[in-house]
Amino acid sequence: MRTFDGLLIEDKKVRQKNLKHSVEFLICEIIENYYRWSDSIKMRNGDDCDYRDVQADEFKNGITYKVNNKYIKIYTVDKWGQRSVWGFVIRENDTVLCTHGLNGGNHFSRGDLLRARSWNQAETKYSVGNILKCTMDNLTKPNPDYPDYKTVWSGAR
């Protein structure tokens, strides 16, 4: 039996499973980057080592994802219940339109990683990589270390 896009049902299930595994791997990488950032802060100022360890554990336990129609939203929940979006992953090809002036009319690919504009909205000007292809296409973008937290989390002291 085939789906409306011509794929065998088994193929579609495998594709969804691969995307889920890629998102879970990305979350592990985000956690690892957060721990590296936390360790670099502890080296700079060793006064709050215990608090940084607790903070890193809370981050690890609070990061999760939610599957929506077009996106997979990756977000964190802190111990007070406050939530913040880390980013979005495109679920299927040709469902999200690129809004950049030079690329207008093109669609994002399945697995493309987008930054968050707000809680429910992704930044659709460009992708910062693709989790299925293991690429980070952001060398010329404003934040070249993304998703490395040494830049993203530089505001904490």
For each feature predicted by the language model, list its residue ranges.
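A short, surface-exposed interaction/processing loop segment used at functional sites
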Residues: 100-139
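Short, flexible coil/linker elements and helix-boundary hinge sites characteristic
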Residues: 34, 42-46, 61-62, 94, ...
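Short, non-transmembrane alpha-helical segments in secretory-pathway proteins
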Residues: 11-55
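C-terminal partner/receptor-binding element of secreted or periplasmic proteins
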Residues: 132-157
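Amphipathic, interaction-prone secondary-structure segments
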Residues: 51-107
